Amino acid sequence: MIRDAVLRGEVAEAARVLARLGLVTAFGHVSARAGESMLITPAADLAGVTAASVIEVPLAARVLPAGVPAEAWAHLALYRARPDAAAIARAQPTAAFAVAAAATVMVPVHGQAAWLGESVPVYGDAALLRSTDRAERAASCLPAGEALLLRGNGALTLGAAPGMAVARMWLLAAACDVYLAARAASGANPVTTLSDDEIASWRAVGGELLPRLWEHLRSGPGSAGPRPGEEQGQGQPGDHRRPPGPRVMPLDLREEREPHRGAPDREET
């Protein structure tokens, strides 16, 4: 029971941070695995979520409880498909929409992006993940790695804890910005992506450095209210000022296949 209460607090705090970072508007959710169930934020503005408003859903659920986001099926599908997934964030970074419309996969072009996976796949169906079948099809695109771009529908990130999933969502937004900027700056020249060895070296230190990123995000200006264990009853969320989300350059990018790592990528002609 104590662990469950702490985990509810972690989910709620992560949700409020996600809102404060400007990565969600009226839509988005955070969840955590809790044994044979998951704890997920309600279908509500994440800026006001508290531990008491987090909802428990069995992983084997065939019907969603009242108040649960309709795309909770995506969380359930990922928990079933990925036993290593302990927490999930669902958001709509602006740059993620741009990359998912322009590419079929995003390979890291800077080191921290490797903490999202050896590459970030794009699920190509823009329909909402409001059914088991659609959610399972999306989950099948992420057999490994920690981030999935959803064409026309935002993104999903995984983590060892709710805060780690949110840190990866922030990092995914930043990685998409860098990717788009690199494509714009390169002009007619191909973009050089990280090699397999470079990706492996960055992934090797992710467990050490990603928690530092989460601490930075949770402690930033307008920090999101009480931390887990500090909430009393419904609690009073803190200052939820939301900075502008990541900017996106308008680019005319064609769909690409996965580039060769460690060498400039080449679009098919």
Would you name each region that the model predicts?
Residues 1-228, 242-252:
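Glycine-rich flexible loops
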Residues 228-244, 254-269:
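Intrinsically disordered, low-complexity, charge-rich segments with an acidic bias
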